[in-house]
Amino acid sequence: MFNKVKVACLILLLGFQGVANAALEIVITEGIDGARPIAIVPFKYQGIGPIPQKISEVIAADLMRSGKFKPVDVAQMPQQPSKDSDINYASWVNKGVEAILVGEVEQQSNGRYLVRYELVDVIRGQITGGQTQMMTNGKLIKNQDHILEARESIISDTGFRRYSHRISDVIYEKLTGEKGAFLTKIAYVIVRDNDDRPYQLVVSDYDGFNEQVLLRSKEPLMSPAWSPDGTKLAYVTFENRQSQIYIQDLYSGKRELVTSYPGINGAPQFSPDGKKLLLVLSKDKTGATEVYLLDLVTRKETRLTRHRSIDTEPSWHPNGQDIVFTSERGGNAQIYKLNLKTGRTQRLSFDGDMNLAGSITPDGKELVMVNRTNGQYHLAKKELATGAFQVLTRTRLDESPSIAPNGSMIIYSTLHNNKQVLALVSMDGRFKARLPVLDGQVKAPAWSPYLQ
């Protein structure tokens, strides 16, 4: 019934302390009819004073955003058990629930907390009454195989959100067989016109919490892109009155100038092995905008496209052998694939009037893009094997889609009330939410890889 795969969730700390409050605040805009019901019961708390963070609320929000789960409203829960032995399996099965998370938080000394939790298959629990027996070395041993996961950990008072995301990852993988992406981060650009340095390069948790400003500038910042190990960001800056590409180390804050040619220096994208960088330059004599490949070790540049039309917005196929890019060589902007070994180019997009900002999902099966049809710019996806096409959003002037490393969600920039905001959509289009910044406009989101 459930894929019982062990999970190892490791966390990368970016070398700076974060604040818990969010500059981005999630607003749900569309529900998740058809998703799997799941119960995330509020954890029982034993301690003096309020609990630093309600773990169950963070987990329920994580799972709902994936589009695959529909957490039961607390007010609709038939009971609120804190451990498996307290669960009335039949009452949950009658509500259509397949799995339930229960747990406890116990305050320790010196700002530490003991957290215990169990993920329970309530259907299996109802069938077996919570106890089964199996033969081991000729002996009949009692087994509780309806408990899919049981863990306990000591965490600090500042670690509740991070640990909640870790539990979400465990649940997601146990119930889907796919790795969760709730411990990841996003990078984006905030523009605050009233600030002395209005352009800010920011990194936060994927849900907008623990925001950290990496760079403030008087000139525009664009196109942040993560290295595959999650330790660096490449981005475009106009600090010296022309476009330049930098790579910045997230641990030390040190940054390195990569290109600063006259004309366009843009759209950096790290290769899957982190050794190369795709970028867009207009440095040749004709001023043509073309896609280049930069070897970060040897600094050798290789021109990949040669066409009189604009070639831009490159991204890597997960196989590391192909790239996709946007080109106007067919008249309107469309998405093409280029094989790095053969140089063969193939058009991938045909639906609507034009298609932009293409990227391939981590499993290599789908193309995500911005599609323009009848003057409307929406996120869409196409199955590469069948050609099946689906529009995912109904927001305005969508741009800059970035896919979660497990392929479950997409973050993008859109227009809401004439203001640029970030938005989330699940890969199946069932769940949608806005992440409006409290001050300023937000654009150019980039989802991190898994953080190890």
Swiss-Prot record:
<keyword id="KW-0131">Cell cycle</keyword>
<dbReference type="InterPro" id="IPR011042">
    <property type="entry name" value="6-blade_b-propeller_TolB-like"/>
</dbReference>
<dbReference type="InterPro" id="IPR011659">
    <property type="entry name" value="PD40"/>
</dbReference>
<keyword id="KW-0574">Periplasm</keyword>
<dbReference type="GO" id="GO:0051301">
    <property type="term" value="P:cell division"/>
</dbReference>
<feature type="signal peptide">
    <location>
        <begin position="1"/>
        <end position="22"/>
    </location>
</feature>
<protein>
    <recommendedName>
        <fullName>Tol-Pal system protein TolB</fullName>
    </recommendedName>
</protein>
<dbReference type="InterPro" id="IPR014167">
    <property type="entry name" value="Tol-Pal_TolB"/>
</dbReference>
<dbReference type="Pfam" id="PF04052">
    <property type="entry name" value="TolB_N"/>
</dbReference>
<comment type="function">
    <text>Part of the Tol-Pal system, which plays a role in outer membrane invagination during cell division and is important for maintaining outer membrane integrity.</text>
</comment>
<dbReference type="Pfam" id="PF07676">
    <property type="entry name" value="PD40"/>
</dbReference>
<comment type="similarity">
    <text>Belongs to the TolB family.</text>
</comment>
<keyword id="KW-0732">Signal</keyword>
<dbReference type="GO" id="GO:0042597">
    <property type="term" value="C:periplasmic space"/>
</dbReference>
<dbReference type="GO" id="GO:0017038">
    <property type="term" value="P:protein import"/>
</dbReference>
<dbReference type="InterPro" id="IPR007195">
    <property type="entry name" value="TolB_N"/>
</dbReference>
<keyword id="KW-0132">Cell division</keyword>
<comment type="subunit">
    <text>The Tol-Pal system is composed of five core proteins: the inner membrane proteins TolA, TolQ and TolR, the periplasmic protein TolB and the outer membrane protein Pal. They form a network linking the inner and outer membranes and the peptidoglycan layer.</text>
</comment>
